[in-house]
């Protein structure tokens, strides 16, 4: 009996479709944000001014993510660099998911697993355009996890070397990569079929490679005594004392993960819903690749090990973890779901799942193109990506150059949290550094800026910017303790370019004269 059931995809055809689709989405998710975002969000502005320092670390993370953005911006320009760099890391992540999927699934299901991750918030989605340490971590997390799988399977030293390199480099993006190393070590210690690898050179080659690659960072950390990023990683989350915190914190973390896991799982419904059987006129998919029991256990460890780590951290410490601290956990989600539940499906179901994934991604892309320009119309406060950064930078540099002919060396500002001075990165100052011709360096206090000091800013001079009219005296009084010669220049208003902006942006500017000027003024 003839049917309209499509034939299963060959491995070559599935690989070709993956490459074409991934490259197309990378191009679109680079072009559309570049064209519609008039400015960047805080994370990206931070990456720019940290990246231009070419340091090992900042007050929140290792700086390789920022350094790579600075490198790409030199070739692609400031406007396109964040989306382009994020797209490159997303491609690495998707390639790793594809290769991981082919270890467990036939070509049709492996392609469906990758396509489902097009709906993942930290890949080709809105958050994927927000180039930051989470985006780079996600890519190297799943990349190193795949390399480790091949190392464990083949027991070849070249794969162990590659896995160690993946973890060692991943630590330069976010310390969280160490959790992956811990999960792999625990798996190898617990799994009865793979425990014997400890008697081979492989795991020790991997460990030595990771440590060797990360040693320069450790040496820098010890020499500079700049441990702020370690403190940030350990304590950057609110805590609640008592049993309520220990109970509610992990539950809140789990609930916050639902927006991350639901889109990929919904895209897989045609496969998962039909997993219990097929119609008589449907052609089943061919047998999936031979998968040993240890491989399935490795996939379980890869998904649930990091999740249990975060839940234990949250429960034991009463720590309310942010949603993005779980973004790396779900990178193998679609592969796991299909490996466990996607049995007895058909090419038609796999094709429908892929179609849903593509439609979802293109709808989200269209939403970015339409809603971002209209955002000031609906939001009470001006979104940061509509902030008139170029205009503020031009204003600040004109104030400096009225006094001095040399480039503006330093710029400081109120923290984006609106907290105390030096509490967090300065939003206004970051825009001046990013868009100004002088590319001034940003100083945000000893716990954030490893590349400067109060003495250096005092010696070379600079500007301080804040939201005029809000806590003027508080900031200026705190500043004068470090910079006695501080002089308020004035308050200005800057008009956002968006026609939907409801009000102007008030900007206060104060001048920090160079120390040489102070000496001249005090000379008899």
Place the predicted regions along the sequence by residue.
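Hydrophobic/aromatic-rich transmembrane helices and adjacent perimembrane loops
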Residues: 53-54, 297, 301, 317-353
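Membrane-interface alpha helices of multi-pass inner-membrane proteins
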Residues: 53, 147, 159-174, 209-212
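Transmembrane-lumen/periplasm boundary regions of multi-pass, lipid-linked membrane glycan transferases
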Residues: 181-295, 306, 311
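Transmembrane-helix signature of polytopic, membrane-embedded enzymes
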Residues: 16-20, 97-119, 138-139
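Short acidic/glycine- and proline-prone juxtamembrane loop motifs at membrane-interface regions
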Residues: 126-136
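Membrane-proximal, lumen/periplasm-facing interface regions of secretory-pathway glyco-
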Residues: 319-323, 347-409, 413-419, 423-441, ...
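Membrane-interface transmembrane helices that cradle and orient dolichyl/undecaprenyl
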Residues: 102, 107, 144-160, 341
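Transmembrane-helix motifs of polytopic, lipid-linked glycan transferases
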Residues: 84-105, 119, 124, 142-143, ...
């Amino acid at each position: 009996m003839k049917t309209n059931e499509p034939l299963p995809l060959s491995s070559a055809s599935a690989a070709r479709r993956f490459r074409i689709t991934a490259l197309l989405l990378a191009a679109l998710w680079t072009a559309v944000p570049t064209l519609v975002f008039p400015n960047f969000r805080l994370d990206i502005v931070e990456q720019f001014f940290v990246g231009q320092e070419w340091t090992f670390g900042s007050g929140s993370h290792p700086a390789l993510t920022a350094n790579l953005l600075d490198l790409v911006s030199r070739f692609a320009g400031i406007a396109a660099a964040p989306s382009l760099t994020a797209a490159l890391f997303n491609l690495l992540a998707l390639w790793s998911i594809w290769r991981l999927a082919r270890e467990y699934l036939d070509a049709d299901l492996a392609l469906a697993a990758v396509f489902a991750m097009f709906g993942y918030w930290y890949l080709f989605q809105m958050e994927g355009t927000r180039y930051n340490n989470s985006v780079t971590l996600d890519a190297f997390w799943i990349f190193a996890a795949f390399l480790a799988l091949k190392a464990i399977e083949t027991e070849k030293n070249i794969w162990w070397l590659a896995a160690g390199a993946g973890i060692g480099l991943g630590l330069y993006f976010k310390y969280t990569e160490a959790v992956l190393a811990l999960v792999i070590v625990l798996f190898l210690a617990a799994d009865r079929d793979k425990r014997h690898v400890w008697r081979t050179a492989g795991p020790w080659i991997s460990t030595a490679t990771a440590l060797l690659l990360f040693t320069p960072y450790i040496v820098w950390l010890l020499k500079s005594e700049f441990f702020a990023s370690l403190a940030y990683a350990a304590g950057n989350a609110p805590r609640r004392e008592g049993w309520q915190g220990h109970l509610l914190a992990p539950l809140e973390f789990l609930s916050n993960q639902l927006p991350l896991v639901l889109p990929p799982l919904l895209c897989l419904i045609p496969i998962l819903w039909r997993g219990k059987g097929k119609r008589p006129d449907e052609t089943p998919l061919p047998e999936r690749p031979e998968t040993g029991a240890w491989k399935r256990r490795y996939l379980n460890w890869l998904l649930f090990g990091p999740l249990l780590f975060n839940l234990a951290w949250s429960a034991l410490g009463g720590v309310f973890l942010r949603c993005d601290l779980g973004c790396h956990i779900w990178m193998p989600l679609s592969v796991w779901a299909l490996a466990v539940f996607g049995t007895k499906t058909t090419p038609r179901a796999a094709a429908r799942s892929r179609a849903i994934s593509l439609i979802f991604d293109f709808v989200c892309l269209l939403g970015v193109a339409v809603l971002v320009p209209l955002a000031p119309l609906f939001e009470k406060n001006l979104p940061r990506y509509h902030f008139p950064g170029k205009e503020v930078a031009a204003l600040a540099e004109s104030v400096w150059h009225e006094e001095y002919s040399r480039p503006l060396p330093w710029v400081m500002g109120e923290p984006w949290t609106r907290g105390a001075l030096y509490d967090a990165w300065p939003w206004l100052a970051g825009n001046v550094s990013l868009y100004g011709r002088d590319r001034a360096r940003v100083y945000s206090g000893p716990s954030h800026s490893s590349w400067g000091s109060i003495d250096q800013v005092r010696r070379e001079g600079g500007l301080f910017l804040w939201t005029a009219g809000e806590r003027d005296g508080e900031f200026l009084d705190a500043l004068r303790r470090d910079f006695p010669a501080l002089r308020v220049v004035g308050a200005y208003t800057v008009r956002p370019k968006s026609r939907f902006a409801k009000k102007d942006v008030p900007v206060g500017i104060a001048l920090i004269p160079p120390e040489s000027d102070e000496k001249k003024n005090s000379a008899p």
